[in-house]
Curated annotation (Swiss-Prot):
GO terms for biological process: translation. Residues 226-265 are annotated as: Disordered. InterPro entries: Ribosomal_uS2 (IPR001865), Ribosomal_uS2_bac/mit/plastid (IPR005706), Ribosomal_uS2_CS (IPR018130), Ribosomal_uS2_flav_dom_sf (IPR023591). This is Small ribosomal subunit protein uS2. Pfam families: Ribosomal_S2 (PF00318). Belongs to the universal ribosomal protein uS2 family. PANTHER family: 30S RIBOSOMAL PROTEIN S2 PROKARYOTIC AND ORGANELLAR, SMALL RIBOSOMAL SUBUNIT PROTEIN US2M. One of its GO terms (cellular component) is cytosolic small ribosomal subunit. The keyword Cell membrane does not apply. SUPFAM superfamilies: Ribosomal protein S2.
Length: 265
């Protein structure tokens, strides 16, 4: 599991919450106090919850699951994209499209269209078209890539979602909850931590804090992948288990003179 210390969190500004007038009372257990009308988050509470969240991400990856990285606010986009690509997981950094999860079949059709346009641009198809047609198709491709490029290799619904700022991504969280997809999220002092499965009390605005969260999430995924059994060992274990079961069900041949065998005959 990626080790992030309280000092690293302090240096990244994880402990700075929102203005006190915007607080959500349900965050009270995680608030240390206030300084200059800004709530200060109790990092002694954050660290264990952070570790629980990272352990869960690692377990998902170890089971070969998919984690969708989500951060569409300006301060999160770069870090989310960079770290998701580093651990080879899907991501969304532009506006969340309603129905991305609950209407995934339609989204897959749009992704197929994106791949079709990308192929047409590289295989020479565009060269056979007139200029204004090419411009129109390129604009369509760019628009699709901006919104769906990060999930074009996500062939099924994700097994978990890692989120920065639950207020900004409220539609996505509602869709995930409806489908029973676990949500791991950074929750600032102005939101309800009960809205997600794994809440990480912390600053969801500071770029350095977001970088810390995203980097740790990617590290957790990579550690989980590294611990996952490879296909060969899985097949070997399954073969051994099948052989053992078969051996248990097979009756050993009776020896001559075996009283129990003679009685049975």
């Amino acid at each position: 599991m990626p080790q992030v210390t309280m000092r690293q969190m302090l240096e990244a500004g994880v402990h700075f919450g929102h203005q006190t007038r915007y607080w959500n009372p349900k965050m009270a257990p995680y608030i240390f106090g206030a300084r200059g009308k800004i709530h200060i988050i109790n990092l002694e509470k954050t660290v264990p919850l952070f570790n629980d969240a990272m352990n869960f991400l690692s377990s998902v990856a170890q089971k070969r699951g998919t984690v969708l990285f989500l951060g569409t606010k300006r301060s999160a986009r770069e870090s989310i994209k960079e770290e998701a690509e580093r651990c080879n997981m899907p991501f969304m950094t532009q506006r969340w499209l309603g129905g991305t999860l609950t209407n995934f079949r339609t989204v897959k059709q749009s992704v197929a269209r994106l791949k079709e346009l990308e192929a047409a641009e590289t295989d020479g198809t565009f060269d056979k078209l007139v200029k204004h047609e090419v411009l129109g198709l390129r604009r369509e491709r760019e628009k699709l890539d901006a919104s769906l490029g990060g999930i074009k290799e996500m062939n099924r619904l994700p097994d978990a979602i890692f989120v920065i700022d639950i207020g900004h991504e409220d539609i996505a969280i509602k869709e995930a909850k409806k489908l029973g997809i676990p949500v791991i999220a950074v929750v600032d002092t102005n939101y309800d931590p009960a809205l997600v499965d794994y809440a990480i009390p912390g600053n969801d605005d500071a770029i350095r804090a977001v970088q810390l969260y995203a980097r740790a999430a990617a590290d957790a995924v990579l550690e989980g992948k590294a611990a996952a059994p490879n296909s060969a060992s899985v097949r070997e274990e399954e073969f051994s288990a099948d052989a053992a079961d078969e051996g248990k069900g097979r009756r050993a041949p009776a020896k001559k003179g075996d009283k129990k065998a003679d009685a049975a005959e």
